[in-house]
Amino acid sequence: MLKLFLIRHGETEWNRIGRLQGHSDTNLSPEGLQQAQIFVKHLPFQHVDAIYSSDLSRAVETAKVIADKFNLPVKKMPILREMNYGIWEGRDIAELIEESPKEFGKFFTDPERCHPPRGETFLECQARLMIGIREIIADHDNQNVVVVSHGAAIRLIISAALDIPIHRLWAISQVNMAVNILRVENGDFTVELLNGTDHLRHL
C-alpha cells in the first residue's frame, strides 16, 4: 500500500489578489512561507520516503520546507505543474469575468468545455498530471510519498482518482497549504483526508 500526501503550495501574492498563475513562475508570499513552516510543525505523518514537486517556484519552495524536516531531496517534475491557462495567465479573475463572461465563465461553470486560448483544457491537464502520478506510484510501492502541486492540479488528480466528473471539479475544496491523503492499493484510490487544514489554525 502506498500513501500519497498531496499538498497544495502555500499562498502567493497572486493567490491573495485573485490573479491566475498557471505556468507563471511565482514565489511564496511571507504568509505562504509561514504556512509551510507551520505545516511541518503539525505534520499528519511521521515518516516520508520521497518528496516530489512541480518545478514551479511556489511549489518547490513549499516542498523544500518539508524536505528539510526529513533531510530529503526535492524531486522536481514539470509534469506536475499547474494547468496552463494560456493568455489568461497573469490576469485578475474578476477582470476576466467582466471582460469575457461567456468564455471565461466556463472556467467555473462548465470546465469540461473550457479551453483557455493557447492553454490546456482541464482534460488535457488531468491526463498529463496522471502520467506523473502513475510514475510515482510505480516507483514507490508500500511507501509514504509527498507530492506538492497546485490548486486546480490537485483537484484534477483527486477527481481522476475518485472518478469525479470534471464538471464537479470546483466542488473539491482546496485552500493554500491544504493536505490530502490518498491510499493507493492495487491501483485503487481511497481518500483518508481531503483539504486538511487543521495545521492552519496555529497561524
Located regions from the model:
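Active-site-adjacent alpha-helix immediately C-terminal to a catalytic or transition-state-stabilizing loop
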Residues: V60, I131-T190
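Phosphate-coordination/substrate-recognition cap region in phosphate-metabolizing enzymes
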Residues: F39-F104
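Short coil/turn segments at beta-strand junctions that form active-site/ligand-binding loops
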Residues: L2, H47-D49, D141-V145
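General small-molecule cofactor/ligand-binding pocket signal
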Residues: F5, K75-M77, E192
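Loop-to-helix element that buttresses phosphate recognition and phosphoryl-transfer chemistry
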Residues: F5-V65, P116-M130
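Short, basic/glycine-rich phosphate-binding loops at helix/coil junctions
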Residues: R16-R19, K102-P116
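Active-site metal-binding loops of divalent metal-dependent hydrolases
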Residues: G10, G151, T197
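Acidic, His/Gly-rich catalytic cores of divalent-metal-dependent hydrolytic chemistry
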Residues: E192-L203
